[in-house]
Swiss-Prot record:
<feature type="binding site">
    <location>
        <position position="149"/>
    </location>
    <ligand>
        <name>substrate</name>
    </ligand>
</feature>
<feature type="binding site">
    <location>
        <begin position="213"/>
        <end position="215"/>
    </location>
    <ligand>
        <name>substrate</name>
    </ligand>
</feature>
<feature type="binding site">
    <location>
        <position position="217"/>
    </location>
    <ligand>
        <name>FMN</name>
    </ligand>
</feature>
<dbReference type="InterPro" id="IPR012349">
    <property type="entry name" value="Split_barrel_FMN-bd"/>
</dbReference>
<feature type="binding site">
    <location>
        <begin position="30"/>
        <end position="33"/>
    </location>
    <ligand>
        <name>substrate</name>
    </ligand>
</feature>
<feature type="binding site">
    <location>
        <position position="207"/>
    </location>
    <ligand>
        <name>FMN</name>
    </ligand>
</feature>
<protein>
    <recommendedName>
        <fullName>Pyridoxine/pyridoxamine 5'-phosphate oxidase</fullName>
        <ecNumber>1.4.3.5</ecNumber>
    </recommendedName>
</protein>
<keyword id="KW-0285">Flavoprotein</keyword>
<comment type="function">
    <text>Catalyzes the oxidation of either pyridoxine 5'-phosphate (PNP) or pyridoxamine 5'-phosphate (PMP) into pyridoxal 5'-phosphate (PLP).</text>
</comment>
<feature type="binding site">
    <location>
        <position position="145"/>
    </location>
    <ligand>
        <name>substrate</name>
    </ligand>
</feature>
<keyword id="KW-0288">FMN</keyword>
<comment type="similarity">
    <text>Belongs to the pyridoxamine 5'-phosphate oxidase family.</text>
</comment>
<dbReference type="GO" id="GO:0010181">
    <property type="term" value="F:FMN binding"/>
</dbReference>
<keyword id="KW-0664">Pyridoxine biosynthesis</keyword>
<comment type="pathway">
    <text>Cofactor metabolism; pyridoxal 5'-phosphate salvage; pyridoxal 5'-phosphate from pyridoxine 5'-phosphate: step 1/1.</text>
</comment>
<feature type="binding site">
    <location>
        <begin position="83"/>
        <end position="88"/>
    </location>
    <ligand>
        <name>FMN</name>
    </ligand>
</feature>
<dbReference type="InterPro" id="IPR019576">
    <property type="entry name" value="Pyridoxamine_oxidase_dimer_C"/>
</dbReference>
Length: 235
């Protein structure tokens, strides 16, 4: 992760005399990475084993939102888009998350299933970057997870036209109240437009911060026979 690529243009408001604030020099903001390193001899043959270890270490370290990941998709026109989503399962070698299928990411994935996932654990000076292909999970699996969600989250999933223009927050609240009234005393059903994606990875990179920006980076690439090739990358 680099903090050196920043705008220092003199016309930037960060260098101006903002009302009630002082100028900020972004180029001077940096930190040294001292938490440790990553050695070739410590790498397992399967990257999912290392990911599991790092994720559990992030959870044990009480990192904020340890399952948060930046999900990248691309529109049919080639326009990239990212957003933060929570990892909800890692099953059979696949990374699973849930969302609105009619959202921007859902419409992207319907046309182009290639996807990227990035985990950043600042407190541990670690990142994991994943590239793969997304596919919808079976409806039964989405139903099972939906039933585990808090009641109000289930109602919200039913009424939110995710990624589309909304007249006002009050309209969203009215829709929520009306939908909740429809399900009093009944099990809230999963709407057809909401469900899970399973990401099958073919490229996983592990990044560990090191002193002097000489970071450790190791890339796992999936091979035709199902094995993973490991190689060190320059920082």
């Amino acid at each position: 992760m680099s903090t050196d690529h920043v705008s220092t243009h003199p016309d930037s408001p960060l260098h101006g005399n903002g009302i009630g604030s002082e100028a900020i020099n972004l180029a001077a903001i940096r930190q040294e990475y001292t938490k440790g390193g990553l050695k070739e001899g410590d790498l397992p043959d399967n990257p999912l084993s290392l990911f599991n270890r790092w994720l559990h270490e992030a959870i044990d370290a009480q990192v904020d939102e340890p399952t948060a990941m930046l999900v990248g998709t691309v529109s049919p026109e080639g326009q990239p888009s990212t957003r933060t989503v929570l990892l909800k399962d890692l099953h059979d070698g696949k990374f699973i998350f849930y969302t609105n299928y009619e959202s921007r990411k859902g419409t992207h994935l319907a046309k182009n299933p290639y996807i990227s996932l990035s985990f950043v654990w600042h407190a541990l000076e670690r990142q994991v970057h994943i590239e793969g292909i997304a596919s919808k999970v079976p409806a039964g699996e989405s139903d099972t997870y939906f039933r585990q969600r808090p009641y109000k989250s289930r109602i919200g999933a039913r009424i939110s036209p995710q990624s589309r223009p909304l007249k006002s927050r009050m309209q969203l609240i009215r829709n929520f109240v009306a939908e909740a009234a429809r399900w009093v005393g009944r099990e809230v059903e999963r709407p057809a437009h909401w469900g899970g994606y399973a990401v099958t990875p073919h490229r996983i990179e592990f990044w560990q911060g090191r002193a002097n920006r000489l970071h450790d980076r190791f890339l796992y690439s999936l091979q035709p026979d199902g094995s993973w090739q490991k190689e060190r990358l320059a920082p």
